[in-house]
Amino acid sequence: MCAVLRQPKCVKLRALHSACKFGVAARSCQELLRKGCVRFQLPMPGSRLCLYEDGTEVTDDCFPGLPNDAELLLLTAGETWHGYVSDITRFLSVFNEPHAGVIQAARQLLSDEQAPLRQKLLADLLHHVSQNITAETREQDPSWFEGLESRFRNKSGYLRYSCESRIRGYLREVSAYTSMVDEAAQEEYLRVLGSMCQKLKSVQYNGSYFDRGAEASSRLCTPEGWFSCQGPFDLESCLSKHSINPYGNRESRILFSTWNLDHIIEKKRTVVPTLAEAIQDGREVNWEYFYSLLFTAENLKLVHIACHKKTTHKLECDRSRIYRPQTGSRRKQPARKKRPARKR
């Protein structure tokens, strides 16, 4: 039997696809449902009420226990609501398919907002929904290319160049270490360096890591250009879930330049000195192993600046992979001088 209260209960009622919310007074669940359908011009058959916060259905039995000003949602046949989770899902859908109306409304709210936290949230929303991620060429998104040389005609080309520049920088650091190698071993060091250089040229300095148009196995991003932080060198993943899409807008492109391709086994402290010592030892060095540590994702992690730990990693090269398996006589050892001190 439908419970009828002596005093009407006042609640706040909204419909699923309506931005309006009304105060409605009723003595029973059925009366409230009827008034709600009239207010929102919805069909009564199949309609029901639920709590806005968690989607619990409001029945005749639980209606008397509702607090005054409870927020309820009116659902028609076939509609569902899971509480705040549904609200968050609808909010997130804005990022995937932003509409001009949403952007305009957010800008209006931001212009009138005084609270710093709400300003930050609205500004972040505008930043993300205003991105022109799908655009690729200078003609499609001229603002993205502001400050870049005219030779860059598309986003993927510039991001590929950006990655190549980082890898070239690592190569220069390895080359600069030549003077630290014993004079008698420098020729072999330069030979190994030359092999690495040829390998890098053949793969275009691994510029594909930042190119969203590259094969999935060759890039560090999604086909849309989203990069996820891989976390500090001593963790499996990023606990803060940092992500960025430098293809979206100019600001994101600039911010992405602060992300690091961090060597898990450190380049200056460990990899390069170990390479030099191995060459001075006289055996044939497995230069491909050192190449992988210096220039490839085997030993590189893409990390947000907050996840880039500057502390000593205290990780060593795999001793079993430093030299090639000996199949003949041992190469004559070069004259050895004092080993160079490891750079700190």
UniProtKB/Swiss-Prot annotation:
CDD domains the record matches: CIDE_N_CAD
Main localization category: cytoplasm
Domain CIDE-N: from-to ranges: 7-83
PANTHER family: CASPASE-ACTIVATED DNASE
Quaternary context: Heterodimer of DFFA and DFFB. Interacts with H1-1.
EC number of the protein: 3.-.-.-
Pfam families: CIDE-N, DFF40
UniProt subcellular location: Cytoplasm; Nucleus
Keyword Nucleus: yes
Catalytic EC class: hydrolase
Designated name of the protein: DNA fragmentation factor subunit beta
Role summary: Nuclease that induces DNA fragmentation and chromatin condensation during apoptosis. Degrades naked DNA and induces apoptotic morphology.
One GO term of the biological process aspect: negative regulation of apoptotic DNA fragmentation
A GO term, aspect molecular function: identical protein binding
Regulation: Inhibited by DFFA (DFF45).
Keywords (A to Z) from UniProt: Apoptosis, Cytoplasm, Hydrolase, Nuclease, Nucleus
Gene3D superfamilies named in the record: 3.10.20.10, 6.10.140.170
One cellular component (GO) term of this entry: nucleus
